Amino acid sequence: MKKILLAATAALFLFGAAGCKEKNNVYPKKGVTMICPWGAGGGTDAILRAVCSTAEKYLGTTITVENKTGGAGSIGFRAIKDAKPDGYTLGMITFELNSNPWQGLQDFTYEAYDPLIMVNTDAATITVKADAPYNTLAEFVDYCKAHPGKVNIGNSAPGSVWHIAAGLFASEAGIDVKHVPFEGAAGAVTAVAGGHIEAVSVSLAEVKSQLDAGNVKVLAIMDSKRPEAYPNIPTMKECGYDVEFGTWRGIGLPKGVSAEIKAVLFDAFTKAMKDENFIKTAKNLNQNVTYMDSEVFATYLKNNYEGTGATMKQLGLTN
């Protein structure tokens, strides 16, 4: 009897251990796909790849970034929303998730997702070619006023964050400019560096490489303070224009992902956000790390959606 009990106990122990092992390894069993709604080389792509490469060691599997571009981000946003809710496909959601519906570019809103974390925020700049005939924002405004409707400001898609940034600046400065849309910031920055357009209204992170190479100059940033890495760049407010504006970026899941899988993903990406290697990489990219947990991010999305609508109505950009 004693031997039978010992055998039964041993069997139960082994079964229980095996069961526990299986439970702890249910997710992830394979690599994860992270959808980026914007093109390679832009600020969204750069910060997403940085956080994913760090999160891999905490998640215990590979995270492959897949760029699905077009429609002011709506193609990528839809791909995230429509993904199978098994935790193996998620993606980065950005400001345009909240601006697209106001233009009729999407038939869904932030409510179609379960927000995981906020990753970063990024202020817009007004950037021009290095040898442009204006060296200050005031000189650029004077140039625009002397050439109404002829100055081209490049940004991302119509109604995108950088388009709105340019619109806010133009409205505040009282200038008439022509907005030139690109499918992401990278193309716009290349165009201004090559002298094909007069200016761009994109983030500092997105002009950094061209700025460091001496191909462009930043006239002002739409932030509350000067950038630490470039203290000579004035804020828009210092230049006489009360404009603070920029994008936000976070990670979203399709509705229906289980609480258990969400918890695993949340833990991995939260640890990644606090990882010194990620923080250093973000700093080198001139990206502002702005962490919000799922609950705080959800509230932020709601408030930002309503505020974005009000701003777009003010600029006449709503459908």
Residue ranges and their predicted role:
Residues K21-E111, K150, I175-E198, V289-Y291, ...:
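N-terminal (or domain-start) structured segment
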Residues K29-G31, S171-A173, V177, V257-N319:
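An extracytoplasmic/periplasmic, membrane-proximal ligand-sensing/linker region
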Residues F95-G104, L168-E172, A199-P231, G309:
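A ligand-binding cleft/hinge motif common to bilobed small-molecule-binding domains
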